[in-house]
């Protein structure tokens, strides 16, 4: 009698135990599936941008404070794709406006985990300075964009987790949580909306070091180049905490103009126009 | 006319007694109904509430804050018990604190010696990095180097690091939602917990917290402290007074209920009106408690007097209401006028105080002529048949005054003139840190900061350049530099933060850290490119917008002052504007602003705005006296005892204290409404004796002393005690106001007893006519 009772208790607890394990492992499996799905989406996004070669873009940066005061800067950016997942792209930014910084050029070799290599050419002193700085999370040109928002988005910079699918405007989007893997990021996480038709980043919410929503980037006016590469011609970043806004408007983006690696060196920086 | 009013009062009193239960029920229900608005009461936590929407200093400061990064801040101040801060141990604490400060809710920027962006040139490399990176492996040479850099950096020395290297600060800039007490409290509490944790793990380190956010947060704390300690204390004092003077349980209980109901009604109405409590308006409950007593005391004293002389309770109630209806109404009216005149004040918290107190006074009047007699009618009342010594003492005082009227007139005249002459010694000073007394942690920490690190008062300038990008112009920068140097030469100036220091440092770094290049770049393009370079190299949370506006057409200069008086602050702000006007291009003209400047102007502006309010209150109150007493002559005589006490109180203050701030501006108006009460009671009795009884002025004075003398003692004692309790407030504006009002009321009684009667006997000598047509249109 007591034996029977014992065994019943035992088998009952066994059932309880295994079902508990099954439950938690199911949750784990879900989590793993979400991570896999998120990573897949990001990989697809990354894959669709492979082989763009090089671009040259003309942009206007419009800064606005919470009071509504505005300021405009103009610049060009040449970007050279560096193949492989472990290194970032190289880019050269040349400032055209305001007039007193015209001709100032900024060369950056993006790194994934280390600080970027950066050089700046100041035409007023005709000197090139290498800048050593941990400014990845710092503001780009006093705007609401940080370097890390603008520099080429390498796949390995983040871990991904799919959250849900939901409509975004007229499209259907996958919502993916991205967590920076590199040091000195200004963010604890980003929530990115990828549209499921072309895997473009339609919208990104950035969360600050306190885990509070810091800013939102909305990209629009997407145009396709070479029948493959999509680029937004309008990027609008709004800082929810300070009320400051920055809009990047591209007037022209040209692909595969034959930019060579040798054109993007410290020594050629002086000669750029 | 007078008989008609008496008859009306008598039938009113009889009605109250007849419908006593209904009256009790209705007053209680009405009170509870209004009091339920109390649930909407909340405390404001924004120091800006002291400034009206059209305050020019507030607007200047707001527009400055629109252009640059906000200035709401928390400053941690760290000081080891002994030795310098430049040790691996302390630098690590500072570094950790800098890092953790990003977790403070609403923080948008953190500045400290460790994350200061130091630029350094090595050949063609420009390193822009945290001044302190790794604390673990720092050698003595490394520590010395960091110390030397920090102390020679104008942006840090005497702002973030003390000259003797023993104290350092970690500055957190906050972006708070406007006037959100919960958000503010959250941020400040978070910082306080961090400070407590650091002190717990590092017992030999002292950590203080100051800044505009803790300042703002200290206001609701002060309001709540006043309401939770002073109001109960006032209750206690009231109970003691009532028991001592009335010697009647029912009378004491009835009075207490009247005062409580009045306060509940006022606070409930404030809740419905959506008023947010500030330290000044938090005085309202205590003030209402105090004032509500006066009405009851007058009604009860007369009633008990009648009962002692053999009248039945209900007859005594009727007689008391007949005699007191008019003076009680009149004193309430004058008090309401006095408080309502606070709406002329520059500082909105005083509007709230005035309006809440006015509602409370009106409620007290209604409740004491309706609820109180009904309550007395249903409760048992016993009085000792024997008269106490009080009255005969008052009669002796009356005889003394009548006997020595000429000497008193001269003596009192001399005292009035003599005391008033000390008004010139009053100095206006509104240092907002000193609004809080030394029991308030914010004050202690701010004093600690001032003694060890840097000043706590700042004057800010937004200085325009000629055009967009113009901050890089050599002309602009040169004048900015001259201005900064001129300011730094002033003994009151502790620190000046200017973009010229950044540009000089960059120029030096771009020239291989050669000290001879520590000067302003002499070309506009060069300066602009330096700024661009610097802007491009800043890390998370740091940007130039704290000092330069977005299109680079203006820059901010922040001047930190030592513990100077608000007069000196105003002077420095004015001299600075003048300097810019005289020495810089016209477009660079700027006025100083900031919290310190706003408070520095507040008392001055408030006095000016209250002048008209006080004058109007004075005219209205005097007119109501003339009308009520139906005598222009008595009205004119009453001007003296109504005006003199406040003037003398200022003189007494000038003699013994000297400094006063915001409080001074509202005293005359609010105390006027209160001190008039004693005059009204005395004059109305005097007038009754002259007109009803046809007595001579000396006999009428005797009658006045006999009938209201002791009631005036009691009410004055209660009022003085009530306002004296306010002087215990930790908030200086309240404490000053309480003490000044207490002094004024005490002086008023002194004047009413010793100066008013001789004046009456001097100017009101002609034989009175016993008819009711007293001089309505006097011949004089």
Predicted ranges, named:
Chain A
Residues 152-158, 165:
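Surface-exposed beta-loop interaction hotspot
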Residues 8-14:
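Sec-dependent N-terminal signal peptides
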Residues 76-83, 161-167, 220-223:
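Short amphipathic beta-strand and strand-loop transition segments with alternating hydrophobic
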Residues 107-109, 117-121, 127-131, 136-153, ...:
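Gly/Pro-enriched, hydrophobic low-complexity segments
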